[in-house]
Regions:
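Charged, low-complexity intrinsically disordered terminal segments
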Residues: 1-188
Length: 188
């Protein structure tokens, strides 16, 4: 297919940075960029990530963001292409929900997007997952898009999917998942 020309109101004035992770040359660049963005968010963080198996630094930064009043909303896939991943995702989702984040499970299939929007100001779009393997060992490439209009468009997609194709993780949902499912979350 053909690339679509940017005909948005901010065409030609967007600031886009490439954050390229090479395990040998720039091993921590994406990890540090994510932690910095989360740690400095003031109002809202919206995340879509299928492998929400969180390294401890990202987990800690998200919990601190919630504590300082940032609206943290995370969308994860209910289904996965890796068998063990759903248990770990559910465990991390539950822990963040208990800390005050809003967690949504996407029911429209496997949502493979990796997007983070911060304070309606900028967004990250790319290949990096928020897990230790992706942030420590894999070759990854993300774009940092410093543009309110683009971020707003991504937020609208997030809100549409959240409101039409997701269910929210609540204490009641967690309670009804049953003992065996929760035990598997804890083990893995």
């Amino acid at each position: 297919g053909m690339l679509k020309q940017d005909d948005t109101p901010t065409a030609g004035s967007k600031i886009v940075g490439v954050v390229n992770r090479d395990p040998y040359a720039t091993p921590r660049i994406i990890h540090d960029t994510f932690v910095h963005a989360i740690s400095h968010a003031q109002k809202q963080i919206l995340i879509i990530n299928p492998y929400f198996t969180l390294c401890r630094h990202i987990k800690r930064a998200l919990k601190k963001a919630v504590k300082r009043g940032v609206d943290v909303q995370v969308m994860v896939s209910q289904k996965s292409d890796i068998p063990i991943t759903p248990r770990v995702v559910e465990y991390n989702a539950h822990r963040l929900m208990k800390a005050g984040a809003n967690i949504y499970f996407f029911t429209g299939g496997f949502h493979h997007s990796k997007i983070m929007m911060v304070d309606s100001l900028y967004s990250f779009v790319g290949s990096a997952n928020l897990n230790s393997r992706s942030l420590s060992f894999d070759y990854e490439c993300n774009l940092l898009v410093a543009d309110r209009y683009t971020t707003q468009q991504l937020q609208e997609i997030f809100v549409h999917d959240r409101d039409t194709r997701c269910f929210k993780l609540t204490p009641e949902v967690w309670k009804h998942w049953g003992r065996w499912k929760k035990t598997k979350c804890w083990i893995f």
